[in-house]
């Protein structure tokens, strides 16, 4: 039981540290990009794979995120922001770099009011509206 508690505690601490690490990049305008690689050992043979690439703008917003699976592109997203740092556009690309779908966002008073998803031909796939109740 004590081992289980210790394991849970270590997991929580590591999770908080990794979360804080990601937040630092968001708040620090000095980070331009981050590349994460992983080394795996199989029968004493070292294999190194790129795990992810993340690029930031001068304000610390993520502008591009590429994740890899065994060294090959798995997911690829690009993001655009308005002057208030609200995400206004998100594009998803396939492994070959072709646009799969894109989303556009609208805001009022800093609150997201609409999300429209388009296919690769700019045809609307879905539209979501957000209605807020305020005090």
Task: Pin down the residues of each PLM region.
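Buried hydrophobic residues that stabilize the cores of well-folded domains
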Residues: 21-135
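Bacterial Sec-dependent N-terminal signal peptides
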Residues: 1-25
């Amino acid at each position: 039981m004590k081992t289980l508690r210790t394991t849970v505690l270590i997991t929580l601490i590591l999770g908080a540290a990794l979360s804080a690490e990601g937040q630092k990049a968001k708040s620090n305008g000095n980070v331009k990009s981050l590349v994460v690689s992983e080394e795996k050992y199989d029968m004493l043979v070292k294999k190194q794979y790129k795990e992810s690439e993340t690029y930031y703008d001068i304000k610390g917003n993520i502008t591009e995120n590429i994740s890899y699976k065994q060294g090959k592109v798995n997911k690829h997203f690009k993001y655009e922001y308005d002057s208030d740092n609200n995400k206004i556009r998100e594009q998803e690309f396939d492994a070959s770099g072709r646009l799969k779908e894109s989303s556009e966002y609208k805001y009022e008073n800093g609150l997201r009011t609409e999300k429209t998803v388009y296919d690769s031909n700019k045809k609307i796939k879905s539209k979501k509206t957000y209605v807020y109740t305020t005090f």
